[in-house]
Amino acid sequence: MISEIIEKWIKGILIDGITGNLSGLFDNVNAKVGEIASDVGSTPQAWNSGIFNMLRNLSETVVLPIAAAILALVMCHELIQMITEKNNMHDFDTSMFSRWIFKSAFAILIVSNTWNIVMGVFDATQSVVNQSSGVIIGETSIHFDRLIPGLEFQLESMTIGSLLSLWFQTLVVGLTMNILSICIFLVTYGRMIEIYVVTALGPIPLATMGSSEWRSTGQNYLKSLLALGFQAFLIMIVVGIYAVLIRNISGAADIAGAIWGCMGYTVLLCFCLFKTGSISKSVFGAH
């Protein structure tokens, strides 16, 4: 009689501990996954206007003069190349100066409007992301009371040893999920910081667009912008796949299997989020 009371008391403590661990197990991950859609669906200006204005000021006051000097050197080199390639001026054609003036004017126009060009790229990619968000993103929150109906009833039918093992597993998984929530934070915030850094240096690579020899630098920069912009679209696809996989766990009979399954899908989510950058760059040929 006393042993049954003690056993019931111990089981009650373990069940309360397990349900308490499960109730807050995925809270941080749910919050971070929920923030992904809003973070990747924001333009650089909307995400943090303070950082945006600071970097725009730096770009226009510090980077742009450097880009202007590079542009002058590039166009002088281009003029020399155009002259020398005509058999050291033996086949001199005055129309080459018209072409050089046109190329110089076009290059100056690009450099002076770098910020508008860069923001235009991100506005275009973000419109794609926002249009697709309603189709791709589903319910991504993990709630064990919904995934496993009758959770407490299942726990009461388990032995003390099984409950103790499950309680320890929830502690380990809880620690892992906190680490995974930090990984999700690193991907989303790291991408935005990379966008700001790349944007601030924009005038320098675009200053090479007027040169037939060095324009690959500017072309690769534009590819990098497109890769960063469409990385958001890939992130949305990954989160959408994650939402579908999580829903497949619904109705699982094995509580421990459901816990580790959810954690496995979340680990897979983090891995795929880290891969979106390299996949996007490979698609656009950026390096």
Model features per residue range: what roles?
Residues 1-70, 83-95, 105-176, 215-220, ...:
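Gly/Ser-rich, low-complexity
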Residues 224-236:
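Alpha-helical transmembrane segments of multi-pass membrane proteins
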Residues 73, 118, 122-125, 183-186, ...:
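Membrane-embedded alpha-helices of multi-pass transport/permease systems
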Residues 77, 187, 191, 228:
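Short alpha-helical basic/polar micro-motif
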Residues 164-215, 233, 237-243:
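Hydrophobic alpha-helical transmembrane segments of integral membrane proteins
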Residues 100-103:
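Elongated alpha-helical scaffolds
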Residues 64-77, 195:
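Hydrophobic alpha-helical transmembrane segments
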